[in-house]
């Protein structure tokens, strides 16, 4: 089934049209990425609106939609209302998670159809990947693995976190990345206790841990990985914590397969860390799904009481963070299968000393 057909399957007498405003839903439905635009989906026709900066690309790349230009400065309202009239739409399902209050107020005031929140339905399909999507994600992760191998010998005592971040970004693009899936996290020494720390002017020192969390975009799909490496040497405590995190990740991976409740996967990994006495230092979830966005649903974390579906792609990233001392996180990306997972991150997970 084509992605657009999945959207059409949502339509009924109660919701007879969809308003796609997020880049991600438009990309999914049209199977082509345009950064600016709006699309209307109905059983009587589908239209995609974008401005002069993107119209040629849209006309050449988008399939299944009639592509029409809009004036960049006057917006989408007239085009949407024309579609509402031409297709006889009475109720538009919209993505409430991707609209500002101002945008929603404008649509409610000016559109000639009833608007109903429909984000869960519109974006629910993305939790299960088609094989062609998985191939793109495997390629994205392959690029990320190559970048990690390339950046390791570039880590030097005396360089700043920002300098290492620049080297990492270069390696990501050099190996085929078409964009960054998020701003890389590069932290060192005591800054590694900050799960989402920001690279700064701190200079890397002998005996530091360095944590790098990074990913690329490939044909619109994200990769994600984290590795913590030691510079010069690692203390016994550093080695101990690293091994606990590695064991927790393995426990989470072993617990993951289609049908297992998301929070139970988290619990399997969390138990290893808690039993080792570090439970209070693991504050975030075990993982998250990813695809067109770096954070999607469903998630293998404590807040998910639902089973993980076959074909979901999710991260496995437990961590321990000791304030003022150091932190460790190890992250791989996995594809959920019937009897386990396919780990598409291929970089080594043993403690690397550079």
Model-derived features: where do they sit?
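Active-site neighborhoods and metal-handling regions in enzymes and metal-associated proteins
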Residues: 1-354
């Amino acid at each position: 089934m084509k992605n657009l057909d999945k959207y059409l399957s949502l339509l009924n007498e109660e919701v007879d049209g969809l308003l796609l405003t997020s880049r991600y839903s438009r990309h999914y439905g049209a199977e082509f990425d345009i950064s600016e635009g709006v699309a209307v989906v109905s059983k009587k026709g589908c239209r995609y609106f974008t401005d002069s900066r993107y119209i040629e690309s849209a006309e050449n790349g988008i399939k299944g939609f009639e592509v029409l230009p809009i004036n960049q400065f006057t917006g989408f309202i007239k085009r949407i209302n024309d579609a509402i009239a031409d297709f006889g739409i009475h109720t538009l399902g919209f993505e409430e998670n991707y609209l500002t209050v101002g945008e929603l107020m404008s649509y409610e005031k000016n559109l000639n159809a009833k608007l109903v929140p429909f984000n869960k339905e519109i974006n629910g399909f993305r939790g299960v990947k088609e094989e062609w999507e998985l191939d793109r994600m495997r390629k994205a992760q392959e690029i990320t693995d190559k970048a990690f191998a390339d950046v390791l010998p570039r880590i030097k005592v005396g360089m700043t976190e920002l300098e290492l971040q620049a080297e990492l970004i270069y390696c990501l693009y050099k190996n085929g990345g078409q964009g960054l899936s998020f701003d890389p996290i590069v932290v060192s020494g005591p800054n590694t206790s900050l799960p989402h720390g920001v690279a700064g002017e701190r200079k890397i020192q002998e005996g530091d841990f360095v944590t790098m969390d990074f990913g690329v975009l490939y044909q619109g799909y994200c990769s994600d990985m984290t590795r913590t490496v030691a510079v010069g040497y690692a203390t016994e405590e550093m080695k101990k914590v690293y091994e606990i995190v590695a064991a927790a990740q393995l426990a989470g991976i072993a617990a993951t397969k289609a049908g297992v409740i998301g929070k139970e996967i988290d619990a399997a990994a969390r138990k290893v860390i808690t039993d080792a006495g570090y439970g209070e230092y693991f504050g975030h979830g075990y993982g998250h799904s990813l695809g067109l966005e770096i954070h999607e649903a469903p998630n293998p974390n404590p807040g998910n009481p639902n089973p993980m579906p076959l074909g979901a792609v999710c991260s496995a990233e437990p961590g321990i963070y000791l304030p003022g001392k150091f932190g460790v996180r190890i992250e791989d990306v996995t594809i959920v299968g019937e009897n386990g997972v396919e780990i598409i991150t291929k970089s080594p997970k043993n403690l690397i000393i550079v």
